[in-house]
Design a protein with these regions (language model features):
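Sec-dependent N-terminal signal peptides
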Residues: 3-17
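Positively charged, low-complexity terminal tracts
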Residues: 19-195
Length: 195
């Protein structure tokens, strides 16, 4: 009986480890964050982006499907271009403090976070991203709030905050679908070696 339980536990562990694979990293506020990916039960590509949470350091947002991943990436490119433009305008005009919204809409995301257990929330969106200059230092960020799907009293704010255009670019690069698919295919090939 003990062997059967161990075998089942090992099988579940290895299957779940294969389901989401770290396919890249990016930099956010000076810290390295992970991008994980996997194929969902519906066959769609899922990308999990590690962000910062209000109560939990380990928060992942899930973008489902290539169409939404492309939309998310396109909006990031627009934000990066605005960041570069407005940072230059702020420096050229000696603007040391300003907060201005960037007119983009990110696709809805699922949010997963660790508290006493794993929590999740579906169909979450970000508040309009903002460009911020504080004491001459520019940053870009957005925030969202997730409420646990089964308990309205369990919630989590989640943040994306970049301090440079290069940090934004690192996430854009990490969300390249062809690179993500390549990483997943390599993992599948390695996994299939052991038949």
């Amino acid at each position: 009986m003990k062997r059967i339980v161990l075998l089942i536990a090992f099988t579940l562990l290895t299957t779940s480890m294969y389901a989401e694979k770290i396919v890249g990293t990016f930099t956010m506020s000076g810290a390295t964050r992970n991008i994980e990916a996997g194929i969902g039960s519906n066959g769609a590509l899922n990308v999990f982006i590690q962000v910062v949470g209000e109560y939990s350091e380990y928060v992942m947002i899930r973008v489902e499907g290539e169409e939404d991943i492309r939309k998310f990436r396109t909006q990031l490119i627009h934000c990066k271009n605005k960041f570069i433009e407005w940072e230059q305008v702020a420096k050229s005009n000696n603007v040391y403090n300003i907060k201005k919204g960037i007119d983009v809409t990110f696709p809805d995301v699922e949010v997963w976070w660790v508290g006493l257990e794993w929590y999740s929330s579906y169909k979450n969106n970000f508040i309009k991203p903002i460009f911020l200059v504080n004491d001459g230092d520019a940053s870009f960020g957005t925030i969202g709030t997730a409420t646990h799907w089964a308990n309205d009293f369990i919630d989590q704010e989640f943040y994306i905050l970049f301090e440079t255009a290069n940090e934004i670019q690192s996430l854009i690069d990490a969300l390249d679908i062809s690179k993500i698919r390549h990483e997943l295919n390599q993992a599948a090939e390695t996994y299939n070696l052991f038949q």
